[in-house]
Curated annotation (Swiss-Prot):
UniProt: ATP binding residues: K604
Family: Belongs to the class-I aminoacyl-tRNA synthetase family. IleS type 1 subfamily.
UniProt keyword terms in alphabetical order: Aminoacyl-tRNA synthetase, ATP-binding, Cytoplasm, Ligase, Metal-binding, Nucleotide-binding, Protein biosynthesis, Zinc
Function in brief: Catalyzes the attachment of isoleucine to tRNA(Ile). As IleRS can inadvertently accommodate and process structurally similar amino acids such as valine, to avoid such errors it has two additional distinct tRNA(Ile)-dependent editing activities. One activity is designated as 'pretransfer' editing and involves the hydrolysis of activated Val-AMP. The other activity is designated 'posttransfer' editing and involves deacylation of mischarged Val-tRNA(Ile).
Positions bound to Zn(2+): C899, C902, C919, C922
Protein name: Isoleucine--tRNA ligase
Subunit structure: Monomer.
The keyword ATP-binding belongs to this UniProt entry's keyword annotation: yes
């Protein structure tokens, strides 16, 4: 018996079965950098239509976590897919560099500014620290396989960006959106600074819940409003969980539309919202009471009530913000300690009292027992004071959600301070922003309603901060009036020019006389810095408008976590609308937060965090990228060892499919060996057509940012259409046909076209593996797949052909039925492999006609040694019914002997003396012109 191994076309490739990604990926990254991959992409895409994804800058502090990885990988998938779609899509990564977290870190190292180091030295240390953090984060982002201009990222602390941020503020001033005034802002006593809305988080806190009497100055006049006469004292009762704000009380708000009741019990009368009387009486433990009369809230407007301990009286005022959700229907109003209170206070001309210092302690001369006391400690003092004065109606502890500093996790207060604001309503900014929101595509679409409601309800934006490390507001204000200099815009440009050369320190080093000359004695420099959300929110102007690679185009897409509706999406919208009158983006895409396999938030204390560095070092970045792409990122994104293991399994299946393609392209030169479509075996054309259909779906999914559907379609193509059908069938032809025959070259032509498309589908997601496949593909080609576009040479079967896609879909179904019978026979130990079988298909007329169309090649599709078609009416009793109408199956042992070369059973073995042990087909392939295949 001869050894025919050398006559077979055995698969061979340098593409290894195991990815070994953790080891190989860093080597690839090194090559990408040395060979200038990002620059090569820029060059290849030069002059194409731009697509700009503007990077929301992560904060330059700490290691990257799994959430950062999700964000950067999603952005990279989009950038790469847009490049393949023929766009010039530069990616300029950025970092947010100013602000409190860095100050706090630097304070731990060098102390507070003005103590051991000067403010200038402190800023320099902050800059140095930010650079160190950026370098560390940059390495991890690059390791993820994210391509971008890492040598020239944008930093909000770049001198030019700092200067452009000042210019952005100047444009807002020019458009009339800047306001100044003492307004209540979120204030962190630990930071000693105001906080942006996005820097406030809510946690449960226990507070005193108190009902307080404000006695009527003239009880008779009040009783008359209710149409009654009484000699009992009358009080208007307020309910609050912040007793510490009572020293700043300047009014009591009622709702003009509500009915209020005068309720008598014991030796007093109280005024309560009529709908809340029973609820309040139950809360304060009073069972015997009577309603003497009712009136509208509007009837009580401007009646006066005595403050319980401050020695003055306050008016009853009307406001729509008063609800019946809780309390008494009367709201204690302190314009210096709350935005609603402030707004209504402005309407009634109330004093904006602020008796609290920046450290959270009462200022001198507030009240004898309160001066110097920290506000949250003062709650107990005030409760006792109210008891003494006979003003405390009820007191209990209550747990509720309370605003806290995102950094310190400590409760914040509302505190009126002199600040600068972007006015939401001064020049129509709110209305224009709401109009702009409607012109943006929000993905998912619920993002639109979310940001609309935030814009509708948000207060003026306080953009000033009392910090050391930040972009200076760069205003010169009059020492007496605090009004900005008449030449403010011109002066700000002068400051910006200096900052562009020397950084923000130029502002603090600036001698006021240098710019103001003789006016210097009347003016002072504002000490305030800009809110860091202004820094990042103005990057559409300071970066996108300024970078040459964007060619003056605005951003197409912003992509961040769903918390950024109130953060970066909001600040960017406000600033862009204030400067340009339009939104800074055309599309906004949000992703959810990462949770563990059980849906719990990631937490170091629970110990359920997943480190991207660990995943990359163990499994490789392509597995991490595949996990991100496989997840519907619009909701919560679950990650665990088990979930990553599933991604690794998916990866292996895709890799093995690619390896099969490459191994079977051994010896194929597309320039010499391609078979024309019309001369190809029909099944091969079908396979290329399946790739064409898959590509249409995949490109649509990429365009819609539906990456989990890209992976599902890719897996369906690799595992079902290719793996369990086409690749199974072609092994025989690929391995046993004459090496240079049309039968084999047709198959290789199909494999070549398909892998050219497949490697491109993979490239945005499994970037390292796609690069590895690209290097193994036959034929002349560019150095990198990432400089290419989607493959355009796919073709398929025409619908008008007899053996069209519909035909092959039916054949697939027949094969599936045959496979079930073969599988059962294997289980029953009747046969070991399908080639030991002969199959007879008893079919109805229509199906029989289709099956007979393949002639002798039907057996290759069914992977049996023999296949016969017969009339269903002739089916014997032992024929197995199938799930297909009009088909019964009989399985028997194949006739003849097993050919040692192709392993098929044949009755013509030994008919050629020189190859006595071969079947006739193999003799033709070894010694003749090679078998002909037309269908399969």
């Amino acid at each position: 018996m001869s050894d025919y191994k050398n006559t077979l076309n055995l698969p061979e490739t340098g593409f290894p079965m195991r990815g070994d990604l953790a080891k190989r990926e860093p080597e690839m990254l090194s090559r990408w950098y040395k060979e200038g991959l990002y620059q090569a992409i820029r060059q290849a895409k030069s002059g194409k239509k731009t697509f700009i994804l503007h990077d929301g800058p992560p904060y330059a502090n700490g290691n990257i976590h799994i959430g950062h990885s999700v964000n950067k990988i999603l952005k990279d998938i989009i950038i790469k897919s847009k490049g393949l779609s023929g766009f010039d899509s530069p990616y300029i990564p950025g970092w947010d560099c100013h602000g409190l977290p860095i100050e706090l870190k630097v304070e731990q190292i060098v102390g507070k500014p003005g103590e051991k180091v000067s403010a200038a030295q402190f800023r320099e240390e902050c800059r140095k620290y930010a650079y160190e953090q950026i370098e560390a984060q940059k390495k991890d982002f690059i390791r993820l396989g994210v391509l971008g201009d890492w040598d020239k990222p944008y930093l909000t602390m770049d001198y030019k960006t700092e200067a452009n941020t000042i210019r952005a503020l100047a444009r807002i001033i020019a458009n009339g959106h800047l306001l100044k005034g003492a307004k209540p802002v979120h204030w962190c006593t630990a930071c000693g600074s105001s906080l942006a809305e996005a820097e406030v988080e809510y946690y449960d806190k226990t507070s005193p819940s108190i009902d307080v009497r404000f006695r009527a100055v003239d009880s008779n006049a009040v009783a008359a409003k209710f149409g009654v006469v009484t000699d009992k004292p009358i009080s208007l009762v307020i309910w609050t969980t912040t007793p510490w704000t009572l020293p700043a009380n300047r009014a009591i708000a009622l709702n003009g539309e509500f009915n209020y009741a005068l309720v008598s019990f014991d030796d007093e009368c109280v005024i309560l919202a009529a709908d809340l009387v029973e609820h309040v009486m139950k809360r304060i433990g009073v069972t015997d009471w009577a309603v003497l009369g009712e009136c509208k809230g509007s009837d009580l407007e401007l009646l006066r009530f005595n403050h319980p301990f401050m020695g003055f009286d306050v008016p009853a005022i009307l406001g729509d913000h008063v609800t019946l959700d809780a309390g008494t229907g009367a709201v204690h109003t302190a314009p210096g300690h709350g935005p609603d209170d402030f707004v209504i206070g402005q309407k009634y001309g109330l004093e904006v009292a602020n008796p609290v210092g920046p450290n959270g302690c009462y200022l001198p001369n507030t009240y004898p027992t309160l001066d110097g006391v920290f506000v949250f400690k003062a709650n107990d003092v005030i409760v006792e004071l109210l008891k003494e004065k006979g003003a405390l109606l009820h007191h209990e502890a209550m747990q509720h959600s309370y605003p806290c500093c995102w950094r310190h996790k400590t409760p914040v207060i509302f505190r009126a301070t002199p600040q600068w604001f972007i006015g939401m309503d001064k020049n129509g900014l709110r209305q224009q922003s709401l109009k702009e929101i409607k012109g943006v595509k929000w993905i998912p679409d619920w993002g639109q309603a979310r940001i609309e409601s935030m814009v509708e309800n948000r207060p003026d934006w306080c953009i000033s901060r009392q910090r050391t490390w930040g972009t200076p507001m760069s205003l010169f204000v009059h020492k007496e009036t605090q009004e900005p200099h008449p030449r403010t815009l011109e002066l700000m440009e002068e400051v910006a020019k200096r900052v562009e050369v020397s950084g923000i320190q130029a502002w603090w080093d600036l001698d006021i006389r240098e710019l103001l000359g003789d006016e210097a004695d009347d003016y002072m420099k504002t000490p305030d810095t800009l809110d860091v959300w202004f820094d990042s929110g103005s990057t559409h102007s300071t970066v996108v408008d300024a970078r040459p690679e964007f060619h003056g185009n605005s951003a197409d897409l912003y992509l961040e976590g769903s918390d950024q509706h109130r953060g970066w999406f909001m600040s960017s919208l406000m600033i862009s609308t204030a400067i340009k009158g339009k939104a800074p983006y055309r599309e906004v895409l949000t992703h959810g937060f990462t949770v563990d396999g059980q849906g719990r938030k990631m937490s170091k204390s629970i110990g359920n965090t997943v480190s991207p560095q660990d995943v990359m070092n163990k499994l490789g970045a392509d597995i991490l990228r595949l996990w991100v792409a496989s997840t519907d990122y619009t909701g919560e994104i679950a990650v665990s060892d088990e979930i990553l293991k599933r991604s690794a399994d998916t990866y292996r299946r895709i890799r093995n499919t690619a390896r099969f393609f490459l191994a079977n392209l051994n010896g194929f030169d597309p320039a010499k060996h391609q078979v024309k479509p019309e001369e190809m075996v029909i099944l091969d054309r079908w396979a290329v057509g399946r790739a064409k259909a898959a590509q249409e779906d995949i490109l649509k999914h990429y365009e819609n940012y539906d990456f989990h559907n890209v992976i599902q379609r890719l897996m369906q193509f690799c595992s079902v259409e290719m793996g369990s059908f086409y690749l199974d069938i072609i092994k025989d032809r690929q391995y046993t046909a004459k090496s240079d025959s049309v039968a084999r070259r047709s198959c290789q032509t199909a494999l070549y076209h398909i892998i050219e498309a497949l490697v491109r589908w993979m490239a945005p997601i499994m970037s390292f593996t796609a690069d590895e496949i690209w290097a193994q593909l036959p034929g002349e080609r560019a150095k990198f797949v990432f400089t290419q576009e989607w493959y355009t040479d796919l073709f398929g079967l025409e619908a008008s052909e007899t053996l069209n896609d519909e035909y092959w879909a039916e054949l697939l179904a027949v094969r599936s039925e045959v496979n079930k019978v073969l599988e059962q026979a294997r289980t029953d130990k009747q046969l070991r492999g399908s080639l030991e079988a002969a199959v007879t298909l008893y079919a109805d007329k229509a199906l029989a006609e289709k099956l007979n169309a393949l002639g002798n090649e039907l057996r290759f599709v069914l992977l049996t040694s023999q296949a016969t078609v017969a009339d269903i009416h002739d089916a014997p009793e032992n024929a197995l019914a199938s799930d297909m109408a009009g088909l019964k199956i009989v399985l028997s042992k194949a006739q003849g002997e097993k050919c040692p070369r192709c392993w098929h059973y044949a009755t013509d073995i030994g008919q050629v003396a020189e190859h006595a042990d071969l079947c006739g087909r193999c003799v033709t392939n070894v010694a003749g012109n090679g078998e002909e295949r037309k269908f399969a």
